[in-house]
């Protein structure tokens, strides 16, 4: 596509006007790094390149890519006219629902308003969040469900939630809706063409709005983006309207979404779901045979392996496992052959997927890493993780030739982008450009890094280690008068240390386990509390201001070995090569995510301590740690920390 030099110059001048004039008029700071990032993004979108943009904390990358997209469309329409291609929307894919909602309800309305007021654009920017039909209400099924519960003594909150769906067709907007009600009223996998409510169906109206030619931005999560790509690859009907450019925010999560998307699994709930749908139409011995045989397969495999909740276990074939897997495959063959022409396509697909998983395990298919894990009820799940994720991403996304921006605060690891390029299938793609936008925050002034020199080497997960760590944490908390976030990589170690300190610390202490958002909210409402956390708190939670003035990273966040990483290791010539190519970059990415909790605004000040002897001067991974983090002043001892806090905090901090 050809753009005149004049149009390019005008587009770049408008970037400067937007960020240097319009945004400051509405109370936003001028950030040179943000402006340069936007220029880079625009050039790559117009040139149909794929840009890997590592954007440091506080850059404002969301406005950077939104402005770039708006100007790309404006000037490509001026240059090429109103061709069908130029009028195609752009897609923004993110990992988190929170960011999707913020883009739709905060970023886009603000940007649209000020650009219209200025005359940069003539019409509002229209956007929609796209997601699977299981999130939406089927009006026909809702009506049937309401009738079914009229005479029943249903939980009042759940009943109120169900009735509220008359006003809200997006079930994610409704609280207290039971999982069973959600399944009973959601849009079915295949809608009947002669549905009596099709003409007034709110879901169909939502789809029509999404396809409107004025709908410039389609927002979705990574899984939906990949599902659309898979549909296109298989010549199925696409989920998204044809688009001309792609923005992947939180791009470091794209490989994980692809692993989930292209991995296969089989568990008890899968069989129960299939039998439930078959049982509604086909009562007979086939259903009992299906349920009994597959449950027995899962039971036998579970008995032949020692599995623990939360731990992936490698699958090992035994004679007994082989016998029951073979029987399961034969049972599936007979059921599929008998019911093939009597059942809907989606149920047949479910049966075929079940058979496929059994075949992967029986034949020990080398295209997959075969492993086992437990569900919440400690029942076995068969898992097959694809070894071809990079190739799938290339085929579904990058080979289509459109411009794309992949951005995140943790794309770069160590000295470059080689790790993320390999993970996302971009290793051999020539049109990739790399760009680093450093954080505008003054880390040298506002952040103090402490790597204790007196850390004792202890056996991992031992009582001695927990006591040593507890002692250091106690000293640090008292030095900063609370206001502390302690990040663990192990829930077991976190629990031990918490029990040791709960009665020793003169500040409120909160321990966050899995799925405990209410505890995080409680911490934010306190003035000088201490939060012990692990898991998602490494990356998805914001603590601006003084609430986190001390961040303690207990251990370097190395991934726990599992069957998938063991399979990866075999691809490298030596263990050292594998550690440097995979293990260290993964650790650096997670470390940067955790470190990012320290400063969330330009005025934040924080002490960051890492209590892992491998990170300290002379430690095994000292250079890798320093390479991953921004340049900060170093603390020699606790006195330096106390001095830093006293000099940067006001009287109200201690109240």
Write out the residue ranges for each language-model feature.
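A substrate-engagement module of RecA-like helicase motors
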Residues: 2-24, 29, 76-218, 222-223, ...
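Walker A/P-loop
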Residues: 47-67
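Signature of the SF2 helicase/ATPase Hel1-core->accessory helical subdomain module
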Residues: 65-67, 71, 98-101, 105-111, ...
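Conserved RecA-like ASCE P-loop NTPase motor core of nucleic-acid helicases/translocases
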Residues: 88-98, 405-409, 482-489, 610-611
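A contiguous, basic/glycine-rich beta-loop/short-helix subdomain that forms a polymer-engagement track
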Residues: 189-216, 229-237, 335-453, 465, ...
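Conserved interdomain hinge at the start of the Helicase C-terminal
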Residues: 395, 454-489
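Conserved RecA-like P-loop NTPase helicase motor core
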Residues: 452-464, 515-616
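Conserved helicase motor "Helicase C" RecA-like lobe of SF1/SF2 P-loop NTPases
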Residues: 489-513
């Amino acid at each position: 596509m050809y753009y005149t030099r004049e149009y390019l110059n005008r587009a770049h001048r408008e970037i400067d006007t937007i960020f240097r004039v319009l945004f400051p008029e509405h109370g936003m700071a001028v950030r040179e790094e943000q402006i340069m990032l936007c220029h880079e993004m625009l050039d790559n979108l117009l040139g149909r390149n794929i840009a890997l943009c590592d954007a440091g904390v506080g850059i404002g990358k969301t406005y950077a890519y939104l402005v770039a997209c708006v100007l790309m469309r404006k000037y490509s329409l001026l240059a090429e006219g109103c061709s069908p291609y130029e009028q195609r929307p752009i897609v923004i894919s993110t990992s988190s629902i929170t960011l999707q909602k913020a883009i739709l309800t905060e970023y886009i309305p603000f940007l649209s308003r000020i650009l219209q007021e200025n005359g940069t654009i003539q019409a509002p920017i229209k956007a929609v969040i796209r997601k699977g039909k299981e999130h939406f209400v089927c009006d026909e099924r809702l009506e049937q469900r309401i009738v079914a519960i009229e005479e029943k003594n249903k939980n009042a909150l759940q009943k109120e939630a169900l009735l509220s769906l008359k006003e809200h067709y997006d079930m994610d907007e409704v609280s207290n809706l039971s999982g069973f009600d959600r399944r009973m009223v959601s849009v079915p996998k295949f809608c009947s063409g002669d549905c009596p409510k099709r003409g007034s169906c709110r879901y169909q109206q939502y789809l029509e709005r999404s396809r409107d030619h004025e709908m410039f931005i389609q927002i979705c999560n990574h899984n939906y983006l990949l599902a659309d790509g898979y549909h296109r690859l298989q010549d199925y009907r696409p989920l998204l309207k044809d688009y001309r450019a792609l923005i992947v925010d939180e791009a470091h999560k794209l490989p994980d979404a692809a692993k989930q998307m292209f991995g296969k699994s089989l568990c008890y709930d899968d069989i129960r779901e299939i039998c439930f749908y078959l049982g509604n139409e086909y009562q007979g011995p086939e259903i009992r045979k299906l349920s009994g045989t597959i449950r027995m397969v899962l039971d036998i495999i579970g008995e032949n392996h020692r599995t623990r909740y939360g731990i992936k276990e490698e699958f090992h074939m035994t004679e007994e496992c082989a016998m029951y897997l073979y029987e399961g495959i034969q049972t599936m063959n007979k059921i599929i052959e008998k019911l093939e022409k009597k059942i809907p396509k989606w149920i047949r697909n479910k049966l075929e997927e079940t058979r496929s998983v059994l075949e992967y395990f029986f034949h020990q298919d080398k295209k997959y890493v075969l492993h086992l894990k437990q569900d919440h009820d400690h029942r076995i799940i068969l898992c097959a993780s694809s070894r071809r994720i990079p190739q799938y991403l290339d085929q579904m996304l990058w080979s289509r030739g459109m411009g794309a921006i992949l951005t995140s605060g943790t794309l770069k690891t160590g000295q470059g982008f080689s790790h993320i390029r390999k993970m996302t299938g971009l290793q051999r793609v020539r049109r990739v450009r790399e760009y680093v936008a450093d954080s505008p925050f003054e880390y040298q002034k506002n952040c103090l890094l402490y790597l204790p020199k007196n850390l004792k080497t202890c056996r991992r997960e031992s009582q001695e280690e927990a006591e040593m760590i507890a002692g250091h944490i106690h000293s640090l908390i008292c030095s900063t008068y609370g206001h502390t976030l302690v990040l663990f990589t192990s829930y077991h170690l976190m629990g031990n240390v918490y029990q040791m300190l709960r009665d020793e610390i003169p500040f409120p202490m909160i321990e966050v386990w899995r799925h405990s958002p209410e505890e995080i909210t409680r911490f934010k409402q306190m003035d000088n509390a201490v939060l012990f956390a692990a898991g998602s708190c490494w990356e998805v939670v914001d603590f601006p201001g003084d609430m986190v003035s001390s961040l303690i990273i207990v251990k370097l966040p190395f991934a726990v070995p599992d069957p998938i990483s063991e399979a990866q290791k075999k691809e490298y010539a030596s263990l050292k090569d594998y550690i440097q190519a995979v293990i260290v970059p993964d650790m650096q990415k997670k470390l940067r995510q955790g470190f990012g909790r320290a400063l969330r605004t330009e005025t934040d000040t924080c002490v960051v301590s890492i209590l892992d002897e491998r990170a300290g001067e002379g430690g095994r991974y000292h250079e890798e740690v320093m390479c991953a983090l921004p340049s900060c002043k170093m603390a020699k001892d606790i006195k330096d920390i106390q001095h830093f806090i006293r000099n940067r905090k006001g009287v109200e901090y201690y109240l």
